Amino acid sequence: MLKTCRGFSLFMNWFNGICAVVCGGWMMLSALVDLPLSWNDWMPLSIYDPFPFHDVFFTSHFWPGLALLLVNGVSNVVALVLRRKGEAEWHRACLVAGILLLCWTITELLIIPNGMSLFYFVLGILQTAAAAVLMKNAVRRTA
């Protein structure tokens, strides 16, 4: 069980760290320059219409891309870096990354429900649960 939790946590750190940084960066770049394959080709800006302040923060994909990069990308990259510092720091960072993913996807599911957000919501539950199991085991070992 612990090996599975460690493996899944590590997978999520790499997967979300890479995907959120790449996709967030692509979204931001698509807002700034004309790309041959732009984020605008995948997702129209009208998808943001249900969000509060959509006419301020969602006039391009820049701010959503920056938020994705910072919230989901950086939190998982930090967790990967902290893995070298020690298990306790890594477990806490994995828990924070999982909770942030849950908050992100819950917001998306409430405002713009879609299958991809549901998929990431399940991943967020699993990431948070895996980190909680690892933290509980670490506390048990030190007690």
PLM regions and their residue ranges:
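Topology signature of small-to-medium multi-pass alpha-helical membrane proteins
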Residues: 1-143
